[in-house]
Each structure stands twice: as C-alpha cells, then as structure tokens.
Design a protein with these regions (language model features):
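Intrinsically disordered, low-complexity Ser/Thr/Pro/Gly-rich regulatory segments
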Residues: 1-154
Length: 154
C-alpha cells in the first residue's frame, strides 16, 4: 500500500485517509474551508463519530532532508488551525497528521503523526483507550534522538 500511496496524487492520498475513517464509521468531509472575521482555514479531512472529531492534515512527503523540520512546522500550523476550528465551532477537535511513511517521531506537541499504513490500527487503538490525553504521555515516553533538528520554541 505504501508503494501505491507514493504513486498517487496528494488528493488521492487524502481520499485514502478519508476512506479509512469512513470504514471506521466516521462521517467525513474533505477539503473543508472555515472562515471567521476574514480569517480562512482549510482542513484536509474532518472526521466525526459520536462526540469525537479529528482534524486531519495529510502530508505526502518522502525523502526530504528537511522533512523533520517541515513536519514540526506542519504540526505548529495544524495546531493553530485546530484552535481556530475549536473556537468557531465550540468543539474539542483532535489534530492529527497522516503521513506517507513512518517518521522518526510519532507525536509532537501532543499531535500524533500516523503513517497511512497504520491509520486503521491507530483508530482501533483509540477505540480501546478513548483517551486523547494519552498522546502527551506517548510523546513523553519516546526516545527522540538528540540530533533531531527541532528549533527552540519562541
């Protein structure tokens, strides 16, 4: 599946992630735009089931030397988009990045980075645990190499 994912356009990569959510009984919208006071944010996937909403950012990057730095920036931007969404909808949506390949990190600043091949298993694990706060614990338990180029927070 990873080889197939590499060859598809990014829009189809998003549809694959949306399909996995749909197969797990989520109501899914793709490429949704929300606006408020002239601010505009786009969401690759919004997946809802019961009282749970995921805001999914799909990143189909592979082989980049600066991929880890780019992922960190993507997490920061997606965290801001999630805060915007939560403010205008009064929901408590969960940010999630879906990647093409397994990354050196699995969670950054409480945001899971899940390879598309493991998305179904990730959803099933959430069904068992049903605790979004475990993302932070998951991050704290990780052994992140010292040479990972994460710039300091400002």
């Amino acid at each position: 599946m990873e080889i197939v994912s590499e060859d598809v356009a990014w829009q189809n990569f998003e549809r694959l992630a949306a399909f996995i959510f749909e197969k797990n009984d989520f109501r899914v919208t793709v490429n949704t735009v929300k606006t408020d006071h002239k601010k505009r944010r786009q969401y690759d996937i919004i997946a809802r089931r019961s009282n749970q909403t995921f805001l999914v950012e799909c990143k189909k990057w592979a082989g980049s030397r600066n991929r880890l730095s780019a992922l960190k920036k993507a997490v920061e931007q997606h965290t801001e988009r999630t805060a915007f969404y939560n403010t205008i909808t009064r929901e408590d949506a969960i940010p999630l990045l879906v990647t093409l390949v397994e990354e050196e990190i699995q969670c950054y600043e409480g945001v899971p980075l899940v390879p598309v091949l493991r998305l179904n298993a990730f959803i099933h694990e959430l069904d068992k645990d049903a605790d979004r706060n475990s993302f932070r614990d998951y991050e704290d338990d990780m052994d992140i190499p010292d040479d990972v180029p994460w710039p300091e927070k400002e």
